[in-house]
């Protein structure tokens, strides 16, 4: 038995396929979902979700949203989603280093919050390309 995973963004269905397992970046940490998981709704943080199908792990950068798990269906609504194939490795690494530097140099609460948001997005994109080994 498998999970039916659907990742939707405001402008398209990003992923709609079967999976054996999915690991979600929730606001309280990573959460794994296997078949026959208890029903739940959870908020998703900016981060990497890992989708396992046929012994292959597919990393996807998610930019915050919600997930609904019910009857072996995982429906994910996110602001944005990216796969390693659409992210440039060099661009992702440069953006990550720049975001890290800006976060370290941020002063004041507003600047720190904005820098943290940019850092999380850049880190998720960088982790996706590094995980796939592109």
Curated annotation (Swiss-Prot):
Compartments (UniProt record): Plastid, Chloroplast thylakoid membrane
Top-level taxonomic group: Eukaryota
GO cellular component, one term: chloroplast thylakoid membrane
InterPro entries the UniProt entry points to: ATP_synth_F1_dsu/esu (IPR001469), ATP_synth_F1_dsu/esu_N (IPR020546), ATP_synth_F1_esu_C (IPR020547), ATPsynth_dsu/esu_N (IPR036771)
Protein topology in the membrane: Peripheral membrane protein
Keywords from the named record: ATP synthesis, CF(1), Chloroplast, Hydrogen ion transport, Ion transport, Membrane, Plastid, Thylakoid, Transport
Keyword Plastid: yes
GO molecular function: ATP binding; proton-transporting ATP synthase activity, rotational mechanism
Pfam families (UniProt xref): ATP-synt_DE, ATP-synt_DE_N
Free-text function comment from the UniProt entry: Produces ATP from ADP in the presence of a proton gradient across the membrane.
PANTHER family in alphabetical order: ATP SYNTHASE DELTA/EPSILON CHAIN (PTHR13822), ATP SYNTHASE EPSILON CHAIN, CHLOROPLASTIC (PTHR13822:SF10)
Assembly with partners or alone: F-type ATPases have 2 components, CF(1) - the catalytic core - and CF(0) - the membrane proton channel. CF(1) has five subunits: alpha(3), beta(3), gamma(1), delta(1), epsilon(1). CF(0) has three main subunits: a, b and c.
Family statement: Belongs to the ATPase epsilon chain family.
Protein name: ATP synthase epsilon chain, chloroplastic
Originating organism: Chlorella vulgaris
Gene of this entry: atpE
């Amino acid at each position: 038995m498998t999970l039916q995973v659907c990742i939707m963004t405001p402008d398209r269905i990003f992923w709609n396929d079967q999976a054996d397992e999915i690991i979600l970046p929730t606001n309280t940490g990573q959460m794994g979902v296997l078949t026959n998981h208890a029903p739940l709704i959870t908020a998703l943080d900016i981060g990497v979700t890992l989708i396992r199908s046929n012994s292959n792990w597919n990393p996807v950068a998610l930019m915050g949203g919600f997930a609904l798990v019910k009857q072996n269906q995982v429906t994910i609504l996110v602001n944005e989603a990216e796969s390693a194939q659409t992210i440039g490795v060099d661009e992702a690494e440069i953006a990550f280093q720049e975001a890290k530097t800006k976060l370290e140099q941020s002063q004041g609460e507003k600047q720190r919050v904005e820098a943290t948001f940019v850092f999380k997005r850049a880190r998720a994109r960088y982790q996706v390309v590094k995980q796939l080994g592109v």
